[in-house]
Amino acid sequence: MIQLNKILVPTDFSDFGKPAIAYACAIAARFEAELHLLNVVPDQAMLVPEVAAFSPESMQAQSESLVREAQRQLAVLPGDDWENGKAIVRQVRTGPAAIEIIEYAKAENIDLIVIGTHGRSGLMHILMGSVAESVVRNAPCPVLTVKPEGHQFVTL
């Protein structure tokens, strides 16, 4: 029988990620698994092409501000979806999202990653890439992708 002890939900706090959190909570409750919520703050160099124009102190302050905001938002998740008595692990990392998600999954021995998709296709997908796709291709464990639209998950 499959046993899931640790479930990871990477989130960017967008509406696209909310269904993934609901799915992960339901699965975690079913398996009495520990839930890991992860937000990855992009590296400053990834956010601002003119990064050389900013002082290191300014960049550090901005990065710290983004991390604090991410921690604040993680603190209220998963909200009412969580009915399991198990612990919730909340983590913020900085760097490229897909790489940080995969490294976290390896380091924490995650059994399942549940990740939302943005539903981009065509040119937008080519230009912007897909964190979910990269995670699916490189994760050390199974990955469940959850589309933002479609079937609603109902717990019984």
PLM features: what roles do these ranges have?
Residues 3, 103-154:
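Gly/Ser-rich helix-loop-strand patches that form or flank binding pockets
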Residues 2-56, 87, 151:
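Small/aliphatic-rich secondary-structure junction motif
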Residues 56-72:
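A short acidic, glycine-rich active-site loop
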